[in-house]
Amino acid sequence: MASTTVWNPAAGVGSLKNSEKYLIDPDDFVGVLALSPCTVFKQGLFVEMSGLRLRALLTATKPAEPKRAVLHRSKRNVCLKACADGSINLAKALSSLRMPLCMVKIMTELSNASAPRGGMYRKRFEFTCYLGNVVSCTKCKSACLIDALLHFYKMDPKCVGEVMHLLIKAEDVYKPSNCVKMKAVNKLCPKAGTCKGKNPICNF
């Protein structure tokens, strides 16, 4: 029986296996994938299809869209491929980063939680946005970051959707809240004044 995998758009068409089953977000294929009242949604969010059909969708001709210039920040080159299957935990893989105390605190709390949900949306948002702004991988073209976060969030369907939206679908990766808000509003900064800059992404 073929295995089922949540499709990571950052992985590219070359990673597809024709015999495998993939769960895709139909929002990624607007104008290409036709849905009907009879379409079956897995976990209420995804459509299942074979790798062969997904390959055809990905290689279908799409209308060209104008590209706007984006200012890219420098990032730390870290490969997180081993985190995608749990061979190495995310905290260990990120040990080379000088993460601010707020992100260390959030990562620890999310890692120790039995589930990534339950009043932790703000923590997930800040942590995902932080990594999206400071980490990249030239080898995997950052696909490993997506897979590592999906594993870190235990493949929870809602969390999968959040990661895909924040790191792939959004035109620009959102920045985490500034340090003042992290301390005064979100209550996620354990000790003010220990970081440089006005945003957690200034520290990595």
From Swiss-Prot:
Keywords: Late protein, Transcription, Transcription regulation. Transmembrane segments: none annotated. Pfam families: Baculo_LEF-2. The keyword Transcription regulation applies. One of its GO terms (biological process) is viral genome replication. Belongs to the baculoviridae LEF-2 family. Required for late and very late gene expression. Specifically required for expression from the vp39 and polh promoters. This is Late expression factor 2. The gene is LEF-2.
